Amino acid sequence: MSYKRGTCLGFIMLLMVSHHHTKGKPLSSLQNLSRLLEDNFERSFGSDEADQQLVPTDSLDQLDPELQWNKNRLEQGDSPHVNEMTLQQLLNDPVGTSRRYRQRNKKGYSRGCFGVKLDRIGAFSGLGC
């Protein structure tokens, strides 16, 4: 009995000692954290230099006319008219949207090998799957 108790206590002490040696130093200040971030990302997070290096978006639009076209297209796509139209289509055809999901089962679509529902193997092409 004492042998088991001694082994258990020895194992616990070994765990405590190994845990004490493997712990790292805690980062206690914000400076240590910011230094760690700067080392990892090679950029200073607290400086204004990063803001000055950014190119304004207006100059990009002047350089490339396709960027201007994409920006205009995205702005037009976010109009409420498009969203209302999509909502209206969904409300007008609730049966059509649910019809797609009726034919599904747990394993997916109930279709054969090539997208056609088969009654038996090889009925469509004579070759099977």
From Swiss-Prot:
<dbReference type="GO" id="GO:0003419">
    <property type="term" value="P:growth plate cartilage chondrocyte proliferation"/>
</dbReference>
<protein>
    <recommendedName>
        <fullName>C-type natriuretic peptide 1</fullName>
    </recommendedName>
</protein>
<keyword id="KW-0372">Hormone</keyword>
<comment type="similarity">
    <text>Belongs to the natriuretic peptide family.</text>
</comment>
<dbReference type="GO" id="GO:0097746">
    <property type="term" value="P:blood vessel diameter maintenance"/>
</dbReference>
<keyword id="KW-0838">Vasoactive</keyword>
<dbReference type="Pfam" id="PF00212">
    <property type="entry name" value="ANP"/>
</dbReference>
<dbReference type="InterPro" id="IPR030480">
    <property type="entry name" value="Natr_peptide_CS"/>
</dbReference>
<dbReference type="GO" id="GO:0005179">
    <property type="term" value="F:hormone activity"/>
</dbReference>
<dbReference type="InterPro" id="IPR000663">
    <property type="entry name" value="Natr_peptide"/>
</dbReference>
<comment type="function">
    <text>Hormone which plays a role in endochondral ossification through regulation of cartilaginous growth plate chondrocytes proliferation and differentiation. May also be vasoactive and natriuretic. May be important for freshwater adaptation.</text>
</comment>
<keyword id="KW-0165">Cleavage on pair of basic residues</keyword>
<dbReference type="GO" id="GO:0003418">
    <property type="term" value="P:growth plate cartilage chondrocyte differentiation"/>
</dbReference>
<keyword id="KW-0732">Signal</keyword>
<feature type="disulfide bond">
    <location>
        <begin position="113"/>
        <end position="129"/>
    </location>
</feature>
<dbReference type="InterPro" id="IPR002406">
    <property type="entry name" value="C_natriurtcpep"/>
</dbReference>
<keyword id="KW-1015">Disulfide bond</keyword>
<feature type="propeptide">
    <location>
        <begin position="25"/>
        <end position="107"/>
    </location>
</feature>
<dbReference type="GO" id="GO:0005576">
    <property type="term" value="C:extracellular region"/>
</dbReference>
<dbReference type="GO" id="GO:0007168">
    <property type="term" value="P:receptor guanylyl cyclase signaling pathway"/>
</dbReference>
<dbReference type="GO" id="GO:0006182">
    <property type="term" value="P:cGMP biosynthetic process"/>
</dbReference>
<keyword id="KW-0964">Secreted</keyword>
<feature type="signal peptide">
    <location>
        <begin position="1"/>
        <end position="24"/>
    </location>
</feature>
